[in-house]
Amino acid sequence: MGAALALLGDLVASVSEAAAATGFSVAEIAAGEAAAAIEVQIASLATVEGITTTSEAIAAIGLTPQTYAVIAGAPGAIAGFAALIQTVTGISSLAQVGYRFFSDWDHKVSTVGLYQQSGMALELFNPDEYYDILFPGVNTFVNNIQYLDPRHWGPSLFATISQALWHVIRDDIPAITSQELQRRTERFFRDSLARFLEETTWTIVNAPINFYNYIQDYYSNLSPIRPSMVRQVAEREGTHVNFGHTYSIDNADSIEEVTQRMDLRNKESVHSGEFIEKTIAPGGANQRTAPQWMLPLLLGLYGTVTPALEAYEDGPNQKKRRVSRGSSQKAKGTRASAKTTNKRRSRSSRS
């Protein structure tokens, strides 16, 4: 490679001198255009002036034989030098590859399938969170450091803050706004519904209550004894039994006493169509008022159900009875005595 570089230096120097002597450029000499132009001039001199030798024609043009030889042989020399450089470079690259391959032979041969599982990774896999797992918070610290340039901390700080503000405006504010609108709409709807229930006029309707009262009366008037027993008593006495009455055979002398219907007590009830009177807050404070039976509904709409109201609706919590230590010790004593008696019995049976 050193010899090729030396030849290249000599060729460049010769071509440069020829270009300075003739006025042609180096590119024209390397391409062969200068040699073709000189040959045309020599041919014209031979035709016009009758010059027969090349040396006389070269001298007539004003060139030396060395310069003419350099100009005429420069294209071929450059082509041969290029081929030489390509050959030397290819051989050197092949030699370099072979040297690296054979020098690193032990490292390039895979031994994974010999002593380990086949298909195992040749390099260790370190995830992005590897150092953050070993040192929690290091990635956040490094990222924050990279955001600010110590040399130009002012513009970098302004760019970072403006970028964070833009992300907040673009991503966070729409989500927060939609959530707040949803909360306000839900709150407004609940408040409007609660105020509507407070201000509306309520009327008593006994139709559903009467239906449940009829069902309650029907099941309360049923006989505590089976109908087959009533038929047996009626057949024995020869009387007719009308079902649907209340029967009682306790201390009864005849079936007439059994089939007597119980007199229902006349209960005072509120008639349908009556309006519930609205109460006004005392003292003229114009506070919001509601009947007691409406409080669970209103407080449930506002989401402020108190523990006392929950106990009123669901009933008191049933707590488990705690067993005292004395009773547990007594129970243990009885168990121990039972075990000892069983042991004594087994001993007596063995003996």
Swiss-Prot record:
InterPro entries: Polyoma_coat_VP2. Residues 312-351 are annotated as: DNA-binding. The chain crosses the membrane at residues 289-309. A lipid is attached at residue 2 (N-myristoyl glycine). One of its GO terms (cellular component) is host cell. GO terms for biological process: monoatomic ion transmembrane transport; symbiont entry into host cell via permeabilization of host membrane; viral penetration into host nucleus; virion attachment to host cell. Residues 312-351 are annotated as: Disordered. One of its GO terms (molecular function) is channel activity. Residues 272-307 are annotated as: D1. This is Minor capsid protein VP2.
